[in-house]
Curated annotation (Swiss-Prot):
Gene Ontology MF: a single term: ATP-dependent DNA damage sensor activity
SMART domains assigned: AAA
Full protein name: Protein RecA
PANTHER family membership: MITOCHONDRIAL DNA REPAIR PROTEIN RECA HOMOLOG-RELATED (PTHR45900:SF1), RECA (PTHR45900)
GO CC annotations, alphabetized: cytosol
Keywords: ATP-binding, Cytoplasm, DNA damage, DNA recombination, DNA repair, DNA-binding, Nucleotide-binding, SOS response
GO BP term (any one): DNA repair
Functional summary from the UniProt entry: Can catalyze the hydrolysis of ATP in the presence of single-stranded DNA, the ATP-dependent uptake of single-stranded DNA by duplex DNA, and the ATP-dependent hybridization of homologous single-stranded DNAs. It interacts with LexA causing its activation and leading to its autocatalytic cleavage.
Name of the gene this protein is made from: recA
Length: 383
């Protein structure tokens, strides 16, 4: 009985070795035909943590959970008219350029304002701009830029303006049922793999439409079919709320609006978080305003009455004066911003990193000393 069991174990082991050998040969052939990294075991992946690029807004980075837009993914930004969709996307463009990357803007709406983009921090001399004649042309241009691997961010503004060539060539009133949806579905199938491979961030701006005859539930939908909804790793719903009034002589003038950005879909962090930002007309998202609000909630900036203080030093009476102080002192702004990001776990604390490095160095030194002692003990000196 024991002999029979042993033979069975030997057969199982031999069969298992042959299967493993066959698998190893298959993996080698796949890598030979399609390149290294075409297939791998999940635990062997070099990068486990999702790489991100800051959105250009601290509040939005926190709401996204990972600290910004994930690289190699598709992002959809949608909302009503004049809600701030393009502003949010342009802040991403400015951030990509700030980090030394190259950004492209596919302006299908033919409505990009260069002076406004420059006011938001975009280097318009370095920005790649295309104003395509049709939806196919715009998506083809985006595809070629992504395939090059040289572009870090591509913004398409907007999906609703990507009109199929057949519709442009036809007459007004002609029926083109599902034409744009089929075009977008094909584009998503072609672009998604290339976007992931080149680690390019693709931002699609979209509009809203109303579904006819909806009695219950949300009647709002986005044009372009369902493909973009499925392929997008992050979907942002941008809504403008109350108007912001000016101060002093401009107290009756609208100088901006409070905007809510809701993360309605997120594949890299928990969804449904919200970011509240102030979009100032002609300036974009108020970075000092959102920093003061978040830092005050975390008690990094202390508020007593109308006064704001940091490190026991008063920085301004009222939020406007505090904003001005941070704008005039970028080193203080950066210091507070870093503390907030550390609190939310978006970045590692420098002091903790230095302590970990010192501890690791100490352990390595101890191991080297132990090995040296063992070698010294083993060596016999002959006279």
């Amino acid at each position: 009985m024991a002999k029979k069991q042993k033979n069975l174990d030997d057969i199982t082991k031999k069969f298992g070795d042959e299967r493993q050998k066959a698998l190893d040969n298959a993996l080698k052939n796949i890598e030979k035909d399609f390149g290294k990294g075409a297939i791998m075991r999940l635990g062997e992946r070099a990068e486990q943590k999702v790489q991100v690029m800051s959105s250009g807004s601290l509040a939005l980075d926190i709401a996204l959970g990972a600290g910004g837009y994930p690289k190699g993914r598709i992002i959809e930004i949608y909302g009503p008219e004049s809600s701030g969709k393009t502003t949010v996307a342009l802040h991403a463009v400015a951030q990509a350029q700030k980090e030394g990357g190259i950004a492209a803007f596919i302006d299908a709406e033919h409505a990009l304002d260069p002076s406004y983009a420059a006011a938001l921090g975009v280097n318009i001399d370095e920005l790649l701009l295309s104003q395509p004649d049709s939806g196919e042309q715009g998506l083809e241009i985006a595809g070629k830029l992504i395939d090059s691997g040289a572009v870090d961010l591509v913004v398409i503004d907007s999906v609703a303006a990507l009109v199929p060539r057949a519709e442009i060539d036809g007459d007004i009133g002609d029926s083109h049922v599902g034409l744009q949806a089929r075009m977008m579905s094909q584009a998503m199938r072609k672009l998604s793999a290339s976007i992931n491979k080149t680690k390019t961030i693709a931002i699609f701006i979209n509009q809203l439409r109303e579904k006819v005859g909806v009695m219950f539930g949300n009647p709002e939908t986005t044009p372009g079919g369902r493909a973009l909804k499925f392929y997008a790793s992050v979907r942002l719903d941008v809504r403008g709320n109350t108007q912001i009034k000016g101060t002093g002589d401009a107290k009756d003038t609208n100088v901006g609006k409070e905007t809510k950005i809701k993360v309605v879909k997120n594949k890299v962090a928990p969804p449904f978080k919200e970011a509240f930002v102030e979009i100032m007309y002609g300036e974009g998202i108020s970075k000092t305003g959102e920093l003061i609000k978040i830092a005050t909630d975390l008690n990094i900036i202390k508020k007593a009455g109308a006064w704001y203080s940091y490190n026991d030093e008063k920085i301004g009476q009222g939020s406007e004066n505090a904003k001005k102080y941070l704008a005039d002192h970028p080193e203080v702004f950066d210091e507070i911003d870093r503390q907030v990001r550390v609190r939310f776990g978006l970045i590692e604390d420098d002091q903790e990193g230095e302590a970990t490095a010192a501890e690791t160095t100490g352990k390595i030194t101890e191991n080297i000393e132990e090995v040296t002692l063992e070698l010294d003990d083993a060596i016999e000196i002959e006279e």
